[in-house]
Amino acid sequence: MKALKTLVSILCVCSLCSCTPAQENKTDDGKNAVIETIMTRRSVRKYQPQAVNRDTMQIIMDCGINAPNAINRQAWEVRIVDNPEVIQKLTELYLKDNPKEAENPNFKNMFRNAPTVAFIANDTSFAYSPVDCGLMAENMILSAWSMGIGSVCLGGPARFMKSNPEANAYLKEMGFSENYDLLLCIGFGYPAETPKAKPRDAAKVKFMD
């Protein structure tokens, strides 16, 4: 009987915990911290030279893989590159095909100058995987910004690495699983600029009666 009462008590506690609503996370000035992070985030294209340390990148990735995803399939794989030699070699290949980019005085590498790059691949056998990867990417970007780390989401480098034979060799070295295709890249780094907000078209959102 005592064991039964104990079990009931545990079940009640678990039930209460599972129904506990999310608590509002506020900054010191009383603002909602999550909303502040979303509304102040900007794409960064100028970075300080040092790579993001791996402990911090692990936190960013932990946030990423906790994104909502269809039937918890987690149909993504990520490779993080912070080796400047690899980034430089890929950039050299990119400049062979895009020599005009070298004329830009702000150009440092093909990942919008970021010193750390996350390569995200999706499971092509699962129809919802591109959406899931997008949700993961947003979690990564926002968590990074909340820690003072800038980012830029990129599709061009992914296309280049799949289409250029020499760059594709680097992609193969990343060892993505069968049926996984490089979908996008995210550059991360400590910002060396403070971009201004760009206008957003609120008229694209309509409430239906």
Residue ranges and their predicted role:
Residues M1-V8:
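Bacterial N-terminal signal peptides that target proteins for export
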Residues T6, C14, S18-D209:
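Acidic, surface-exposed loops and disordered segments
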